[in-house]
């Protein structure tokens, strides 16, 4: 975090112990990568992404989203929803709206969000996506936690069979 502040970029994601993602202007990110390598950190690399997501550079998008969200009639959640912008359970429709708005520029507290679920007694997690990225993060957060990764029809069928 100190390095991010030093090179004027934002912490975009706190994914797992030892994995932090920064976001900002390209020059700042390049300086952060060089600084990470110079500080002896295990890895620092630039990611090929389309924007400076979860950073203050997304403020105008956040403002536009806030205007749109004012028009949305959110229902009260019927099951627990965790906001990963502050790693807590949202408390209602207005809280969901505010969390969605803050998500645009706020840091993703993935590790803390998963710890919250683990502390609540959840033992099995299901990930949908082309690669088991979140399963890898969970292994760093708490080794041995069961994660079922679903990436295609076959893995979906296997997951359904496991829970049947």
Language-model features: locations:
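Acyltransferase/transacylase module recognition
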Residues: 73-164
């Amino acid at each position: 975090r100190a390095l991010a502040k030093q090179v004027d970029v934002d912490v975009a994601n706190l994914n797992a112990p030892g994995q932090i993602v920064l976001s900002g202007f390209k020059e700042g990110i390049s300086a952060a990568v060089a600084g990470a390598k110079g500080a002896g950190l295990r890895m620092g690399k630039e990611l090929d992404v389309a924007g400076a997501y979860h950073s203050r550079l997304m403020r105008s998008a956040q403002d536009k989203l806030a205007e749109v969200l004012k028009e949305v009639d959110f229902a009260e959640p019927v099951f627990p929803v965790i906001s990963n912008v502050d790693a807590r359970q949202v408390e209602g429709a207005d809280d969901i709206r505010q969390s969605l708005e803050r998500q645009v520029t706020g840091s993703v507290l993935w590790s803390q969000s998963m710890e919250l679920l683990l502390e609540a007694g959840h033992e099995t997690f299901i990930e949908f996506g082309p690669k088991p990225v979140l399963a890898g993060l969970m292994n760093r957060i708490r080794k041995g936690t069961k994660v079922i990764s679903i990436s295609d029809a076959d893995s979906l069928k296997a997951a359904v069979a496991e829970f049947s």
